[in-house]
A protein has these predicted regions:
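Conserved C-terminal helix/tail region of periplasmic/extracytoplasmic solute-binding proteins
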Residues: 359-366, 370-373, 383-443
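Glycine-centered hinge/linker elements that transmit conformational signals in sensory
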Residues: 185-189, 225-256, 297, 301
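Short, solvent-exposed loop/beta-turn-alpha elements that line the ligand-binding surface or hinge
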Residues: 120-131, 174-177, 219-238, 244, ...
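Extracytoplasmic/periplasmic substrate-recognition and gating elements
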Residues: 287-356, 360
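Conserved N-terminal structural module of periplasmic/extracytoplasmic solute-binding proteins
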Residues: 2, 7-107, 422, 426, ...
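Extracytoplasmic/periplasmic solute-binding protein
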Residues: 142-150, 155, 182-228
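Hinge/lid segment of periplasmic solute-binding proteins
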Residues: 102-156, 182-185, 293-302
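Extracytoplasmic "Venus flytrap"/periplasmic binding protein-like
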Residues: 63-134, 166-170, 268-269, 287-290
C-alpha cells in the first residue's frame, strides 16, 4: 500500500527526484546500505549470468558504496509486463513491485512514465554517448530516458545440425536458400516431404516476421488504432504467405520458445530471439529417448526477395526503476554504470547471446575468445546482419504484446487440426483466410 501511494505521489510531483548527474554529494552509505529489489528476464535458473553479476556487484562495489540488490522475480520478457501490471494493481497473489526491473518500452508506457526514474537525471549526455545510439533512442519516451539499454537482441534461425546434415545429404539443401522468405518456404515444404510430415521451423514471433517481410516490400505504415492497418494489402499478402505455410504444416507457432521444439526433434529449426542460444542444449533428445549432438547451426533472418531495404529487428528489454527516493535512484544508477562498463557488458553479452550496448564492447566482439563454437557462430551472424541490414525497433504500442499473445494462443490451438481439416477437404486458402480473420478480430 505504501509503495502504490508513493508512486501516485511521484506522478503528481515530477521534481521529487533531484538531478543526480551533476551532484557531488552521495546519498549512499556503507553503514546503512540501500536495498534494491530487482526483477529480470536473463535466465530463470538460479545460476544465471545475471545473478552471478548481481552477486559480484553486491560483494564489491555494492559493499563499498552501501548498495544491496536482491532478486525477487526471475521471469521472461513475454510475461514481465503483465506481472508488473498485476503488482501495480495489487492483485491477489501478485508480488510486491520491484525497485529496478526489466521492461520493454511499451511496458514502461503502460506503467506510466511519470512514475519512472528519468535516467537523464543521473547520466550526462557524454555518459550516454558511450552507448549505441539506436539502443539509447529505443528507451526514450516523450523525451525521458526511462528505459536504460543493457542488452539487445535480434531474430535469426537456429537449426539442429545433425538432422540438417541428413536432410541436406538426401535433398541437396543449402543454408544459402534461407536468405529469402521464398527460399525459406521452399525449404520448409521440402523438409516436410522428406521427414514425412514434420514441420520445418517453429516461429516465436510470427507477427514480427510478417511485418518485416511487408516493410521490405514497401508496405509503408502498418499500424492503426493500437493494432494493424487491416486495409494494407502488402501486409495482408505477407500474412497470407505465412498462413499458408502454417496451414500446410511447413511451420508452426512455437510453444512460447522454439528451442523446445528443436531440442525434442519436433522441428528441424527455430526462428526467434538470438538470445535463445542460452537455452539450446548440446544434445537433442528425441521422443524415443535417443540423443545426438545438436551441432547448432545458425542463419540470418530471411528477407523479401529483391528488397533494397533489408531490415533486422532490434528487440530486448532494458532496465527501469520506479521513482521512490533519490537514494534508491542513485543506487540504481551506480549499478547501471557498473553493469554496462565495456568489458563487463561484452562478457555478459557473450554469456547470454545478446548484443552489447556499449559501442566499444560491440566493436570488441570480433576479438572475443568464445568458449563455445555456437556462440562464435552467433556473433559472426550478428556482424553479418549488422553490416548488411538496417535495425528496426519493436512497435511501441501499449497493449500490443497482449494482443499478439492472444493471437498466438489461438493459432496454437488451430494448427493442431489443420492437417486433418485439409485431408477432410477444406481448402488451403479458406483455412489461411481463417487465420487472417483471427488477426482482424484482435483489433
Amino acid at each position: 500500500m505504501e509503495r502504490r501511494t508513493f508512486l501516485k505521489l511521484a506522478a503528481l510531483v515530477p521534481g521529487l527526484a533531484l538531478a543526480g548527474c551533476g551532484g557531488s554529494k552521495t546519498l549512499l552509505s556503507p553503514k546503512d546500505p540501500t536495498m534494491l529489489s530487482i526483477w529480470h528476464v536473463y535466465g530463470e535458473q538460479a545460476d544465471s549470468p545475471m545473478n552471478r553479476l548481481l552477486t559480484e556487484f553486491n560483494d564489491t562495489v555494492g559493499r563499498e558504496k552501501g548498495i544491496l540488490l536482491n532478486v525477487t522475480n526471475m521471469t521472461n520478457s513475454a510475461a514481465i509486463g503483465g506481472q508488473l501490471q498485476d503488482a501495480k494493481a495489487g492483485k491477489p497473489g501478485a508480488l510486491d513491485l520491484p525497485d529496478l526491473f526489466s521492461a520493454h518500452p511499451s511496458d514502461a508506457s503502460a506503467l506510466g512514465i511519470e512514475t519512472l526514474v528519468n535516467w537523464n537525471d543521473w547520466f550526462t549526455a557524454e555518459d550516454m554517448a558511450a552507448y549505441v545510439p539506436g539502443f539509447v533512442q529505443d528507451g526514450i519516451i516523450e523525451g525521458r530516458q526511462v528505459v536504460f539499454p543493457v542488452s539487445k537482441s535480434t531474430q535469426l534461425i537456429f537449426l539442429n545440425g545433425s538432422q540438417y546434415a541428413r536432410f541436406a545429404a538426401d535433398t541437396g539443401a543449402q543454408l544459402s536458400t534461407l536468405a529469402t522468405w521464398d527460399g525459406f518456404f521452399e525449404m520448409a515444404a521440402a523438409y516436410r516431404q522428406w521427414s514425412q510430415g514434420k514441420p520445418f521451423c517453429a516461429l516465436d514471433y510470427p507477427l514480427r516476421l510478417v511485418e518485416l517481410n511487408a516493410l521490405e516490400q514497401g508496405s509503408g505504415e502498418l499500424y492503426k488504432d493500437c493494432w494493424y492497418d487491416l486495409t494494407n494489402e502488402v501486409f495482408r499478402a505477407s500474412w497470407m504467405e505465412f498462413a499458408r505455410g502454417l496451414v500446410q504444416g511447413d511451420i508452426l507457432v512455437s510453444d512460447l520458445y522454439s528451442n523446445t521444439q528443436v531440442m525434442t526433434g519436433e522441428t528441424l529449426a527455430g526462428l526467434g530471439s538470438s538470445a535463445a542460444i542460452l537455452y539450446y542444449n548440446d544434445f537433442v533428445t528425441y521422443p524415443d529417448n535417443t540423443t545426438e549432438p545438436t551441432d547448432l547451426l545458425l542463419a540470418p533472418l530471411p528477407h523479401a526477395a529483391g528488397t533494397t531495404t533489408p531490415l533486422m529487428p532490434q528487440a530486448g528489454v532494458g532496465l527501469c526503476a520506479f521513482q521512490t527516493t533519490d537514494q534508491k535512484a542513485e543506487a540504481a544508477a551506480v549499478f547501471l554504470r557498473w553493469f554496462t562498463e565495456q568489458q563487463r557488458n561484452l562478457e555478459f553479452a557473450a554469456d547470454t547471446g545478446y548484443m552489447p550496448v556499449s559501442s566499444a564492447a560491440f566493436d570488441a566482439i570480433a576479438d572475443y575468445p568464445f568458449e563455445q563454437q555456437s556462440y562464435q557462430r552467433l556473433y559472426d551472424v550478428y556482424n553479418e546482419m549488422r553490416i548488411q541490414n538496417t535495425p528496426l525497433s519493436e512497435p511501441g504500442i501499449v497493449g500490443y504484446h497482449a494482443k499478439a499473445k492472444a493471437l498466438y494462443d489461438s493459432l496454437r490451438q488451430l494448427q493442431k487440426d489443420y492437417p486433418q481439416r485439409l485431408a477432410d477437404g477444406e481448402t488451403l486458402e479458406a483455412l489461411a483466410e481463417e487465420t487472417w480473420q483471427l488477426l482482424c478480430d484482435n483489433a
